[in-house]
Amino acid sequence: MEVNQGEIVGFLGPNGAGKTTSFYMITGLIVPNAGRIFLDDEDITDLPMFKRAQKGVGYLAQEASVFRHMTVEQNIMSVMEMSKQFTKAEREERHEALLDEFNLHKVRKSKGIQLSGGERRRCEIARALAIDPKFILLDEPFAGVDPIAVEDIQYIIAKLKYKNIGVIITDHNVGETLAIIDRAYLLYEGSILQSGTPEDLAADEEVRTKYLGSTFTLKRSAAFLRAEAGGPQRLNTKAEHEAVAPSPQSEPTVPEE
């Protein structure tokens, strides 16, 4: 499996297929029992999570991760203060830019516990981008978000391509996910059943039989159509003898389960 910078790739599949496990292996939350993970031709399989983050692998967990008793601006700034890549002036400038980009100015003084589902997600994504990652993994980004806010989150995710960020997304809301991704890997019982564009998967009879259902209809979201763009570089995952990860000309990998 591989993911390029500047594209959005879905990890799809039924419960127990291996989606979250793959995420955990990429981020370093668990150690794979087979296969290797590479980033920019560097084997990062044995690196701890914080080292992977320093090298450009961001992660947004399925569970709410906003600091509940800190304000929005404190949530974002706290992450940047742990990084030595920005000066104080650069941190302040970047902080204001993120608040503006994610439309968080009105709630900047609000504590995490006071935010709506959509505001919380925007804050979490802004915080994940604070240290300028090459790749970001989004685990269930639409969970706990009301339908009206889903399109806002879709647009934010779709725009990440313009920043040359590689996005890996998994969500049980398959319709909303396929509506914004460039391509996907469909995991089934720990293996890759099929891969391709949303159109390829929607037209595949085996995919419809085992996962999408016979009545599924693919509909691209307005967010995707507005934000459609491209970019270089890759992240990927493979079997033990050929695992790989992203780079301008290289890629990260996660082993099969």
PLM ranges: what are they?
Residues D43-E63, K88-E92, L201-E206:
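ABC ATPase NBD coupling module
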Residues K111-L115, E119:
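Conserved ABC ATPase signature
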Residues T27:
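Helix-to-loop junction immediately C-terminal to a conserved catalytic motif
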Residues D132:
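Conserved catalytic motifs of ABC-family nucleotide-binding domains
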Residues L12-P14:
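The feature captures the beta-strand-to-loop junction immediately N-terminal to the Walker
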Residues A89-V107, Q154-A158:
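Conserved ABC ATPase "signature" region
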Residues I136-E140:
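Catalytic Walker B motif of ABC-type/P-loop ATPase nucleotide-binding domains
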